[in-house]
A protein has these predicted regions:
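Short, hinge-like loop/turn segments at secondary-structure boundaries
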Residues: 50-54, 102-103, 126-127, 155-158
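Structural beta-alpha unit
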Residues: 1, 24, 74-108, 145-158
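Glycine-rich, Arg-bearing micro-motifs that act as flexible, cationic patches
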Residues: 107-132, 147-150
Length: 158
C-alpha cells in the first residue's frame, strides 16, 4: 500500500514515537523511509548587523544539532528498511510541504506537539499545518500525555 514514507523528525519525544510507527509501517509494507528535519536559517539581514558572527555560530550549532538528530534517527532504522535522510535549511512548515510535493511520498508520519485543543487552535502547529495542506495522507502520532496534559484534558472534557 505504501511505497515511500516521509517522517518528520526534530528530536522530540513525539517525533521519536512517530519514527517508531513509521519504521513498523515501512517494515510491514516493504516501503522506503525518508527522514526529514529542518533547521530555520536567520533572515539574511541579520548577518549584516553587529553580533553577526555570534549569530553565525548559533546557526552552525543548530545545523550540527539537527544533523545529529537525523543521524541518531537513521541509526534506529533496521537494515531491512531502505532509508534516506534530508536536512532542509528553512522553517519546518515550508520544508515539509516542499518535500511532500517534490518527493514521491504516499504517506507523511509526524508527531503531534501534544497541545490541548484550545492551545492548538490559537497557536497552530507544524503538524496541524501539514495535515491541512498536504496532498498525501498524514499520520499524526500523539505522544504520551504527562500529568499536566491529562489534567488539562480532564478539565476540558468537563
Amino acid at each position: 500500500m505504501f511505497r515511500n514514507i516521509l517522517v518528520a523528525i526534530d528530536g522530540s519525544r513525539d517525533a521519536d514515537r512517530a519514527l517508531v510507527h513509521a519504521i513498523d509501517l515501512a517494515d510491514c509494507e516493504h516501503a522506503k523511509l525518508t527522514l526529514l528535519s529542518a533547521v530555520p536559517s536567520p533572515p539574511a539581514f541579520a548577518y549584516a548587523t553587529p553580533g553577526a558572527s555570534a549569530l553565525s555560530d548559533l546557526d552552525e550549532k543548530a545545523r550540527q544539532e539537527t544533523e545529529a538528530i537525523v543521524r541518531t534517527a537513521r541509526d534506529r532504522v533496521p537494515q531491512s528498511v531502505s532509508v534516506t535522510t534530508v536536512v532542509k535549511i528553512e522553517a519546518a512548515k515550508p520544508a515539509l510541504l516542499k518535500q511532500i510535493s517534490e518527493g514521491d511520498h504516499d504517506l507523511v508520519v509526524m508527531g503531534s506537539r501534544g497541545r490541548g485543543a484550545v492551545r492548538s487552535a490559537l497557536l497552530g502547529s507544524v503538524s496541524h499545518h501539514v495535515l491541512h495542506h498536504s496532498d498525501v495522507p498524514v499520520l499524526i502520532v500523539r505522544g504520551e500525555r504527562d500529568e499536566g496534559q491529562q489534567a488539562e484534558a480532564a478539565h476540558a472534557a468537563g
